[in-house]
């Protein structure tokens, strides 16, 4: 398959290398040509399973060149980059292409809405995963280490009516697990569950320099807040009628006896900690805050509210991160009301997510 991979971060490197090693024709796009010289000779993937030096079909700063002939466009970029990305994609997409966001934080709906509002071309479908396919860190100009891969990758499609055909194309690439729709996948994203508590409750240590929030920063007290947020996420999912698996953090990530049922499989947390790659310098500009807190938590809170599920821990985190960032987070970012869905009932939103831009309600949400 011809695959375009957009971005130059750790996730993009891991994606491009892994898919190229799997035999796909991969072209990588980055905004600046000066950033591409290092990968034109290939990207080295250090990982369990598939690994080695991956040769790319091309590496280019010309987005049109990267997208030309690509059946699949993978965007392993933070959700904070989606606004810029959609402006670039608008004139170039074709109605045969699939755009995959890894993960999406409900970006599949947000990007489709933004494209429609600005007159851009809509693809065949948007898809989004509920988590990162790889837990990875770049370790050199053309090297990336991915000690952990997703083994269960919840994947939602917008419009959900096109799920069968989209997942049939994605299944040879990833261990996709069918989600009901894009919001189902977005509410499986545990980044907003784990990262905001880890950052907030370790703020003092983080201010002191390099620190591993997943190791020293994960104490019993921190876990209590993570578990509370996850409990509210599960209540929201049930309120929306989404079926299991819910990928509960307490049992499918922190509990080794059930980790095989989780997003990353047995031993995932141990592999992450043993790698030492997450002993790093964090700040309020890190995606743990700008993406997982500002966007992910705002989505969780609004989804809970729409489903009449209580979310005091999520709301409290939003208020505190709003103070730290100096701006209001509640009702903004990826909150449903910020995406034109605030006036719709839960059942109307689910119908819209299924029918997509063919729905009579589409014109209301793109005003």
What are these regions (language model features)?
Residues 23, 56-57, 70, 96:
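Short, well-ordered alpha-helix to beta-strand connector turns
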Residues 55-69, 179:
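Short acidic low-complexity segments
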Residues 133-229, 352-366:
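Substrate/ligand-engaging "lid" and interaction regions
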Residues 74, 79-142:
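Rossmann-like NAD(P)(H) cofactor-binding subdomain of soluble oxidoreductases
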Residues 222, 230-272:
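Small-residue-rich helix-loop
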Residues 1-48:
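NAD(P)+-binding Rossmann beta1-loop-alpha1 motif at the extreme N-terminus of oxidoreductases
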Residues 254-258, 266-353, 360:
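Long, low-complexity C-terminal extensions of enzymes
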């Amino acid at each position: 398959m011809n695959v375009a991979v957009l971005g130059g971060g750790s996730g993009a490197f891991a994606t491009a290398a892994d898919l190229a090693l799997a035999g796909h024709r991969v072209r990588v796009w980055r905004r600046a040509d000066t950033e591409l010289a290092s990968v034109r000779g290939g990207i080295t993937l250090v990982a369990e399973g598939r690994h080695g030096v991956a040769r790319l079909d091309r590496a280019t700063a010309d987005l049109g060149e990267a997208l030309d002939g690509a059946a699949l466009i993978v965007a392993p970029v933070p959700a904070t980059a989606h606004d810029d990305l959609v402006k670039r994609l608008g004139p170039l997409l074709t109605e045969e292409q699939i755009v995959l966001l890894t993960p999406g934080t409900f970006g599949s709906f947000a990007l489709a809405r933004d494209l429609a509002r600005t007159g851009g071309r809509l693809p065949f479908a948007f898809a989004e995963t509920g988590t990162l396919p790889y837990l990875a860190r770049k370790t050199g100009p053309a090297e990336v280490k991915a000690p952990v891969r997703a083994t269960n990758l919840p994947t939602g499609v917008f419009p959900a009516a096109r799920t069968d055909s989209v997942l049939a194309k994605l299944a040879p690439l990833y261990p996709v697990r069918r989600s009901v729709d894009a919001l189902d996948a977005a509410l499986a994203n545990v980044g907003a569950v784990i990262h905001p508590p880890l950052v907030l409750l370790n703020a003092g240590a983080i201010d002191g320099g390099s620190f591993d929030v997943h190791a020293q920063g994960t104490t019993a007290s921190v876990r209590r807040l993570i578990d509370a947020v996850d409990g509210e996420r599960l209540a929201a999912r049930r309120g929306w009628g989404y079926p299991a698996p819910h990928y509960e953090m307490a049992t499918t990530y922190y509990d080794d006896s059930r980790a095989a049922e989780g997003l990353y499989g047995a031993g995932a947390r141990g592999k992450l900690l043993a790698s030492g790659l997450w002993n790093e310098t964090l700040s309020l500009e890190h995606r743990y805050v700008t993406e997982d807190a500002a966007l992910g938590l705002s989505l969780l809170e609004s989804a809970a509210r729409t489903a009449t599920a209580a979310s005091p821990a999520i709301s409290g985190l939003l208020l505190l991160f709003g103070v730290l960032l100096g701006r209001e987070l509640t009702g903004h970012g990826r909150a449903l009301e910020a995406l034109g869905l605030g006036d719709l009932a839960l059942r109307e939103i689910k119908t819209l997510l299924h029918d997509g831009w063919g729905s009579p309600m589409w014109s209301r949400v793109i005003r």
